């Protein structure tokens, strides 16, 4: 199922990404642009996973551990999460044969979970 981030990502990023089941494994530095696009569309990046792409599979390398509680301000929640997502990616930059999966949610997707 396509989520809101998938809907707003440009085809150019999707074309360079590896599709693993229903998730895009986005290469560096495209992942930084994807986080920026998420921010512009008020989509919170709740977590980042780094994978090595091996053959037709993925090998988990690292994952983010930041976590914020949602208060009354969705925009602040998005900013807090996405700044941490960007910092995590910048501190865990990987080259070829690697990519990132962004776990994300828009306000209405989050509300649907409740």
Task: Name every feature range the model reports, one short phrase each.
Residues 28-33, 55-62, 108-114:
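Short, solvent-exposed polar/charged micro-motifs at secondary-structure junctions
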Residues 52-79:
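Acidic, low-complexity, intrinsically disordered interaction modules
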Residues 1-25:
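Long, contiguous N-terminal structural blocks used for assembly/anchoring
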Residues 22-29, 69-72, 76-83:
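Alpha-helix boundary/N-cap detector
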Residues 27-56:
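Short, well-structured hydrophobic secondary-structure segments
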Residues 14, 21, 46-51, 95-99:
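N-terminal targeting/docking segments
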Residues 79-114:
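Amphipathic alpha-helical binding modules
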């Amino acid at each position: 199922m396509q989520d809101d981030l998938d809907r707003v990502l440009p085809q150019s990023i999707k074309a360079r990404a590896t599709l693993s089941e229903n998730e895009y494994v986005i290469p560096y530095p495209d992942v930084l642009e994807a986080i920026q696009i998420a921010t512009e569309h008020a989509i919170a990046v709740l977590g980042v996973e780094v994978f090595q792409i091996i053959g037709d599979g993925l090998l988990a390398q690292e994952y983010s551990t930041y976590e914020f509680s949602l208060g009354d301000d969705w925009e602040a929640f998005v900013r807090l999460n996405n700044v941490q997502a960007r910092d995590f990616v910048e501190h865990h930059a990987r080259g070829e044969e690697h990519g990132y999966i962004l776990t994300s949610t828009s306000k209405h997707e989050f509300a649907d979970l409740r």
